[in-house]
Amino acid sequence: MELPWLDLPFTLLTLLLATRLAYDYYGVVAATFTGSFSLQIFLFYCFARWYRHTIAARAAADADGDGGGGAVADEEAAPPVLIPLLEGRGGGGGGAGAASSLANRCFAVVFMVFVPLVIVVFERSQADVVAYALCLANILVMVVWLSPDAAADPASAAKSFLRLSDDEDEGSCSGSGHGAAEDKCCVCLAGMREAQALRDLPRCGHRFHAKCIGKWLTAHPTCPVCRTTAVPPPAPLPASGDHADDAITPV
């Protein structure tokens, strides 16, 4: 069942209910604090939902235009830590489903905190039934209706977190000296192309942008990848005394 925005009114009602409880039983100060905190939660939740929806729509549009290549580019451009939490349902197949499920359950746990508050504070009347029903409806909307139909892949989140390490293991920042299109300059972390001014270190053969490695070598005498000495040591100064005088050509 796909009801992507139905959780927003339930979330707003739950937060308004918590603010009203604080006002009725603890006064204006508690209501002000609860209302401000509830507003922050709701705004952040709306932003997260909008971000996920935007990423999913953009990935779907790029996949239609580029035959699937655009989705991979968006996945590489997105921060690896945010992908498991904010990626949309249509942005990455099984990984996107796992991300959607993870995000929904995280928000559900947050709002489940209000359920004990309602049970403890409310008096025995019909109001507690209404409040408890609202909280349960919010949790059901977020956990059941918004969960993906397919089973979540438990390895997708870990794979997203380890994307940077995988890139380093595959040698994407090695600069092997062949000028491959996927090589990256380990100084500025940008891609390298043959049309750019590149420089190979003589001893190890690692390749970098000429400008980047020039600035690096002014402060460090070693290769930023393998730490091999790239700059020859300075020539020894002439010894003091007679040898220094002999080195001077007489006028």
From Swiss-Prot:
<dbReference type="InterPro" id="IPR013083">
    <property type="entry name" value="Znf_RING/FYVE/PHD"/>
</dbReference>
<dbReference type="GO" id="GO:0016567">
    <property type="term" value="P:protein ubiquitination"/>
</dbReference>
<dbReference type="InterPro" id="IPR001841">
    <property type="entry name" value="Znf_RING"/>
</dbReference>
<feature type="transmembrane region" description="Helical">
    <location>
        <begin position="28"/>
        <end position="48"/>
    </location>
</feature>
<comment type="pathway">
    <text>Protein modification; protein ubiquitination.</text>
</comment>
<feature type="zinc finger region" description="RING-type; atypical">
    <location>
        <begin position="185"/>
        <end position="227"/>
    </location>
</feature>
<keyword id="KW-0479">Metal-binding</keyword>
<keyword id="KW-1133">Transmembrane helix</keyword>
<keyword id="KW-0833">Ubl conjugation pathway</keyword>
<keyword id="KW-0863">Zinc-finger</keyword>
<feature type="transmembrane region" description="Helical">
    <location>
        <begin position="127"/>
        <end position="147"/>
    </location>
</feature>
<keyword id="KW-0862">Zinc</keyword>
<protein>
    <recommendedName>
        <fullName>E3 ubiquitin-protein ligase Os06g0535400</fullName>
        <ecNumber>2.3.2.27</ecNumber>
    </recommendedName>
</protein>
<dbReference type="Pfam" id="PF13639">
    <property type="entry name" value="zf-RING_2"/>
</dbReference>
<dbReference type="GO" id="GO:0016020">
    <property type="term" value="C:membrane"/>
</dbReference>
<dbReference type="GO" id="GO:0008270">
    <property type="term" value="F:zinc ion binding"/>
</dbReference>
<comment type="function">
    <text>Possesses E3 ubiquitin-protein ligase in vitro.</text>
</comment>
<keyword id="KW-0812">Transmembrane</keyword>
<keyword id="KW-0808">Transferase</keyword>
<dbReference type="GO" id="GO:0004842">
    <property type="term" value="F:ubiquitin-protein transferase activity"/>
</dbReference>
<keyword id="KW-0472">Membrane</keyword>
<feature type="transmembrane region" description="Helical">
    <location>
        <begin position="102"/>
        <end position="122"/>
    </location>
</feature>
